[in-house]
Amino acid sequence: KTDNLGIETNITYNDWGLVLTQTDHLNNTLTNTYDNWGKLLTSKTNLGGTTTYTYEKLSNGDAKVTEYSPDNDQKITYTNKLGQNYKSSVKGFAENSYVSQEVQYDVLGRKIKESEPYFEGTSASKWNVTEYDDYSRPIKITQYTGKITTSSYSGRTVTATETNANNRFKTQVFDAIGNVTSTTDKGGTIEFKYNAAGENIESKYDKNVVATQYDNWGRKSLFNDPSNGIYQYEYNGYGQLIHTTSPKGHKYYNYDEYGRLYNQTEASNDGTSTNKNITITYNNKGLITNKNGTSNGKAYSSYVNYDANGRVISSGEN
């Protein structure tokens, strides 16, 4: 595949459409191997090393997958006959220690209990519990910390109330597509409105209203916060931000023919507190190498050097 900079990534596949090798323009390589069932056995990169996977069927019919990282750390996942992951273990910091976490399901396949991480050799003792109504909607979530979230449903509206161990509460109301329409705590209620695209257009607390406008492409064009002022946004034909106006001043963004930012200027309305002009340069691999310009009358420059694989080997600024 080739991107807009003309940079190529070469990929090969097996007969099943699985990636065998991938090499990018920096000669970073990925090589995968699979078993006869298409399960990943090894994944090797020239920089990170080899990750190995083993698969085991347990006597009760469950499956165990072990992932060995390049430094030989292990991650073990247990899956039941229904394909549900019910336990995972990762190597801990202490020698020969493992940290595990468990999940339990009901007969309908719904997650009803999830443990907090615990050290292998002990048993899970801290659980987060979920209860459902007859429509499989969560109605109560009890966390091990004592925080309880209850949800009630009325038509297309969902009301969720959180109460912690100190009896502090927060209630949120959601519309049919999951947008928060109001939030209430002891400080009061904040109400939210949205447009047809689901974008927030108004947030109201008491008599204070924060409004947001969007252009025909769904891009934020104006933000009006009575406590901070009005912010305006302009874009080019590719949807890239080119100009912002705030109560304090202006910012301009310029892009090259490949869509990369190459110049940024900032100027305050008073003409003195902020005055920046920064130019960015790239190497033939598309990586930033230099930033040069002025900031409030002082020269500014920074640089980044990379190795053949695109990793940063040195950087600095003046």
Question: Predicted regions: what is each one?
Answer:
Residues K1-N318:
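Acidic, low-complexity segments
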